[in-house]
From Swiss-Prot:
SUPFAM superfamilies: Protein kinase-like (PK-like). It comes from Enterobacter sp. (strain 638). PANTHER family: METHYLTHIORIBOSE KINASE (PTHR34273:SF2). This is Methylthioribose kinase. Pathway: Amino-acid biosynthesis; L-methionine biosynthesis via salvage pathway; S-methyl-5-thio-alpha-D-ribose 1-phosphate from S-methyl-5'-thioadenosine (hydrolase route): step 2/2.
Amino acid sequence: MSQYRTFTAQDAVEYAKQFGGLDNPSSLVEAQEIGDGNLNLVFKIFDAQGVSRIIVKQALPYVRCVGESWPLTLDRARLEAQTLVEHYQHSPQHTVKIHHYDPELAVMVMEDLSSHKIWRGELISGVYYPQASRQLGEYLAHTLFHTSDFYLHPHAKKAQVAKYINPEMCEITEDLFFNDPYQIHERNNYPAELEADVAALRSDDQLKIAVASLKHRFFSQAEALLHGDIHSGSIFVAEDSLKAIDAEFGYYGPIGFDIGTAIGNLLLNFCGLPGHLGIRDAAAAREQRLTDIQELWNTFSERFQALATEKTRDAALSVPGYASQFLKKVWTDAIGFCGTELIRRSVGLSHVADIDTIKDDAMRHECLRHAITLGKALIVIADRIDSAEALVARVRQYS
């Protein structure tokens, strides 16, 4: 049995030779550490011609951006690998392929996506992938439907819930989404110029009650196997292609959480675009984001309902009209969770480049305020926004 050790670049090369599944493993000669996230080491493995062939990812036993003072379970590597393997079974065209994983070393070997680019960077630059939102909707529909009560036998579903219990990573989400932004906490991160805006979050009882309701659903609604962190930085895109990666927050939770997180990141980009592009280009890109949001939800809901009509196994859940009713609740959840994503990415520990890389301080602060104001509104009035078109109208109202 393997014993955990932190990989060096050479360790990653040797591991890729053994478990990468390549026809000519001896061609692998060099590794480059490319991880820019908070939790892991990520190595690109190159052959003698300088071509990247495979990826080796290893979990660290602490939060990288904080240090060893914030320890983390290594079991998250198993949960991430198993989540991606499960999602790949249901949406292979939109999920990164895992070739091998070792739970003792907390390491996995996965396909190289050098032909793709991280969606967040492309969104910031104003590069438009018209298929991406629809493909993300397809990914979410297939992965969430096929791991839900609509499709799984009750015994299998309960076994899956137990298999994917992920308490330490869920606790991070619970703190960063639902606790920290609404109290004074050392993890919070925002400019002094926003102190009044953040203080208003802490004093808004109506908002905090709505956030408590969302947190309660996150605690208790084991509806499907979530990706758990499906933002534009955990999605790779290319022409006519989209792949989800980075699922260490995977667990059984409310379907609306994945939908809301995805929509929230599109709205964070919407808020930040005036700080990156000229007036006309920013306005055009903002319209694209609003179209993306509508296409994401409409694709997801149409595909989920089609799958429910075709494949639902439970007699009660297969009653005509129930899937549509269920999705109305998912949508309301999604709007609320979307709002928490907007707020926590503006005042909490982990921000997004869509806003944080804006060079002009005044513009950056204005974009942060926009995200906070929009997030508050969506959380509080989620049950009054009954469609993607209604959401777009609300976003325009707060722009």
